[in-house]
Amino acid sequence: MTSYLWFLLAAVFEIAGCYAFWMWLRLDRSAWWIAPGLLSLVLFALILTRVEASFAGRAYAAYGGVYIVASLAWLALIEKTRPMLSDWLGAALCLAGAAIILFAPRLHTS
């Protein structure tokens, strides 16, 4: 269960870090946005190592579903744009895939 919390926290920092660069490069905001963006992305990387997984690639793949849902929440809460039904349907499919990756029985460790 703690992996979900780490995934969610990682998503917040990754999205915030990327959004800081979006602010600078796409919305013509100050280059000072780079500093919090870099800090946020470093925290994202550190936090993602806390996930209970034997292999990095599997952790990243499972995290992808959480990232997509968190991105849609960011769209709604920060950018004040309502996600469309197709956004939520796509996110649901991705979460299903992430759940399969996360919960599938492991017959082999490689």
Curated annotation (Swiss-Prot):
Pfam families: UPF0060. The keyword Ubl conjugation does not apply. Keywords: Cell inner membrane, Cell membrane, Membrane, Transmembrane, Transmembrane helix. It is a multi-pass membrane protein. The keyword Disulfide bond does not apply. It comes from the Bacteria. It is found in: Cell inner membrane. GO terms for cellular component: plasma membrane. The chain crosses the membrane at residues 5-25, 31-51, 59-79, 84-104. Belongs to the UPF0060 family. This is UPF0060 membrane protein Pmen_1247. It comes from Ectopseudomonas mendocina (strain ymp) (Pseudomonas mendocina). The lineage of its organism: Bacteria, Pseudomonadati, Pseudomonadota, Gammaproteobacteria, Pseudomonadales.
